[in-house]
Amino acid sequence: MINLNEPYDVYVATEVGDISNGGVSKWVDDWVKNVASHLIVKPVLIIEIEQDDGWVEYVKQFVDVIHRPGSSWEYEYTMSQLPIANYFSLPDRKAVDMVIKGARKFHLLSYPLPIMMYGNSKDWSTEKMRKIYKRKIDSVCIHSLESETLKYQQKFRKFTKKSLGYQQKSIDFQNTLIKDGEVSIWIGLDNEKQFDFMIPNVYKFEHNLNAVDSNVVGFPARCEPRKNLHFLQNINSVAFTSEVTFRNIFDDYKKKVKFNNIEIDEYRVDRIEDFYKRTDWGISHSCFENEPFGYSIFQSIDFGKIPILHKNWCKDMEYPFRATTQKQFEKQVAEISKLSIEDRNTYLNNLRSYLSKYTSVEKWRDELLSIYNQDGDQIWLPTDISPSKSV
């Protein structure tokens, strides 16, 4: 338990470590590893979790639960293996609200989706959701725009009027947090003008494997409409994703979706590398709509898989295998299938060369620290001998 009487800053996320749904957890893990240790004011990580029985039981697998009957801090849910103080918003908000209230500064590392989900279940207004954080927001990092993600899925899926209203609330809530943040940060590759800073994610190519001699298509991503999983209906493929979501997500699609030859490899964060090391797939379905960064794209390239990219992803990069429709995607699979291993390796090397601009962990770290370690006009970075000003 932290000393609430000493100065500390709060950083809020929704995923970390084994509690993972995708790219946000990877970003937070990198933040904990590379940024947290260089913060000049003690950091406290808050993990927002949906407060229902299912989530409580899920999270209990990975955290320590400390019970102090009769105390003001009765329950403490924490992941002890993390190198910084951390607390989960379970079994209720009492503990984390107390920590947030006493913080010197308050930063959002990602969009707090669980608050929106809980608020919608209670039919809260956007204004009431915002009041969960009864304080100034010093910075907010955005990993994807709800306005783009939700509007895209509305093209494919049928929703009730009530559900569409909830989605609009999510768009409005995210926009409110961006507007209220003293500093807003976009983590994507392409510039979004509504943000104060553009600090793209980082991925360091460490494997640089040769191309895999297989024409099976791999899908290493979540089952959500903008990932365009339905492009694989007629393709020999394997998907590293949630089987439960896969079995249910297409029920309300406007057009029938039927897969002829797809294997589902159940997603687990501890099996990510194992999936990429499989040699029975060599083409990566990386054709995602509105993809801000795309860890799975970088990972596919790192592990020797030829990606099929969306036409709008990293548009300045010359690359022939791109698509926006299922028909175009199938055509690109056929084109890649004709390539020799030598040609595939040439494409992979060119991709790695261009994307190397996003591999500097130190640059990424220092750009974030220039925000978190700022006090007035003074900033301390790890290259300095000592903090420029005591805070």
Predicted stretch roles:
Residues 112-114, 146-148, 167-172, 187-208:
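Short beta-strand->alpha-helix junction loop in the catalytic core
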Residues 14-29, 225-227:
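A short, glycine/small-residue-rich beta-strand->loop->alpha-helix junction that serves as a flexible
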Residues 284-296, 311-319:
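Nucleotide-sugar-dependent
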Residues 26, 338-389:
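A charged, aromatic-enriched C-terminal amphipathic alpha-helix characteristic of glycosyltransferases
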Residues 302-310:
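Short hydrophobic beta-strand element within catalytic cores of glycosyltransferases
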Residues 10-13, 203-227, 233-239:
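Conserved donor-binding/catalytic core segment of Leloir-type glycosyltransferases
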Residues 70-73, 251, 259-276:
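Conserved active-site histidine-acidic residue motif and adjacent donor-binding/catalytic loop
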